[in-house]
């Protein structure tokens, strides 16, 4: 097994946590294969692509109790990957959530 740098492990933890905060039963949405695609990207360490799949799942599955936690974890993952535009977009989504 290859050693994983701490930064990659941290990104993986944030992405996994983000998925955890989505509903267990996802709405089928426009792209029903998104969750399987997300998992495939994780296993191939294509974390930026996994992040984008999760973003799509988050956009399709709104209004759940843990939505703020989902976007927070996604923002933290984006920050770890140096994706400032993504991170800013996710923090803005949190600001727009109903309180």
Predicted feature descriptions by range:
Residues 1-99:
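C-terminal-biased regions
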